Amino acid sequence: MRTRHTPILPLLAASALLTAAAPAPDARVTLLDAMAEELQRNQQQLKLQNHDAPYFMSYQLKETEQSALTARYGAIFVDDTYHDRKLYVDVRVGSYDFDNSGPEEYEYFGGGRGSSYVPNPDGPIDDSPLALRTSLWLVTDQKYKAALSQFLKKKGDNVYAVEDPKQPPSFSKEKPARYVQTPVAFPFDHDRWARVARDVSERFKAHPELFDSEVRVTADKVKRLFVSTEGSRIVTEETMYGLHVSAVTRADDGQLLDDSRNYYAPTEAGLPDDKKIADAATKVIEELLALRKAPAIDPYTGPAILAPEAAGVLFHEAVGHRLEGDRQDGDGEGKTFKGQVGKQVLPPFISIVDDPTVRSLQGEPLNGFYEYDEEGVKGQKTVLVEKGVLRSYLLSRRPLEGFLLSNGHGRSQGTRKPVARMANLIADSTKQVDDVELKKQLIAEAKRQGKPYGLIIRDITGGNTNTSSYGYQAFKGVPRMVYRVDVKTGEESLVRGVEIVGTPLSSINRIMATGRKQGVFNGFCGAESGNVPVSTVAPALLLQEIELQRAMEGKDRPPILMSPASSTTASGEVK
């Protein structure tokens, strides 16, 4: 009988090839499993004697990676990278109908005995399941004790409060979500962007009137892992690239003037090319030099056209913030639109939706895109105003009367508590005219009101608003490029020195007509839950009346000596 000997080395080699071909485990899922395991342990065992156990818990790990370059005067000033992981733990005691959540005072109650140490909400940068679980364990313990304290305080306060039969539940019941996003590439050509930043910032040296300037390039990646006792398991990744060109100068009367161009994109390739960046710098220079020579105008009340970006800021400040669901409750809020569902709140030709599911519009990327919000609810298109009639609010998992489910707008920055926030606010109109006709109507309205001119606001830096009940219900916008339109000749002349002010209901109901083309305003919005990326899309607006107040004038002198950068000879010597 002959024995056949099989070669061992080829088998070992084949085995090695099979092993090498096996995909590496997804580190994100490994960490997600660790979070779920620690969550389950706390769900089953966490309970203080003679007190309630949590009825709901969720864990979120938010990992941020950032690269940033800043150049001034042709040189790099900032060359940074940043990487961290932050934890947010939500622990709720009671029930969906009545739990520890409520006004801010409950959030801070329990700051006395037993809470002299607050654990750090950082997560490990290393992919260590045990270290992650340990960090979550410590934060969960602190959050549970605080939740118990808040719950008892809330129950005590209810002894003195009149029962409200229309009081909505404390927390919405949502279906669990399962989603693991494919990893997103995060390239950043450091050398190229350093060169671009240097070259573009160099262009400002030829204009000593612009005494400071900056070119900033950023690349951010946010990875989010979320688990809850309801069964949600979510992994998302988002990237955002930014390029910002800015400069400042002073007018002869001392007023500080600034201008900028800001670009955002979800990919590095989406940022503008070298020529467009150079053109942006040229435009900033030209506009600031023109603003220095422009006359300051007195406060104004009369008709005006708001270009699409400026119109977007108006909708964001005057309408959007007041439709955030969390602002419809609580004694500290003005509740401008509470109880107005089904009623006319805007002109009948205006409709507004907020849609975090839209990545881009007309080729422009939108900052407010996301898959799931910070409470584990899928982002949803929400009709807010339909033909002038209020239909809904932006909703987190904090229910409102008549709105018991979230529509995926619970948003936050870092470790802040999520609240209802805007994402992509999109305004549309059925009363559209072209730009030429819009200007004709502006002139006609100014004549009707006996005004020597109307205004066109073509650019705006942003705005802010007050929604609380402790102050005036007002908003403010900071226009940058304002043009006075002579009613006799139609000639446009640049002016400066004013800010838009107004009350929301009055301002938005003075819209007479809109332009045909929508414009995109990308940026970040700051509120209680931090700074979140947002977009506003709107057409140009013709307002029957707008109020502009005098901006802060400032009487500071410009720098006394010439900048050494602008007075340097070819040999490098300063004159």
Feature annotation, model-predicted:
Residues 20-377, 381, 386-389, 402, ...:
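Active-site bordering "gate/hinge" segments
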Residues 140, 357, 377-575:
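Long, low-charge, small-residue-enriched segments that form tightly packed helices used
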Residues 9-19:
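Bacterial N-terminal signal peptides
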Residues 1-10:
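Bacterial N-terminal signal peptides that target proteins for export
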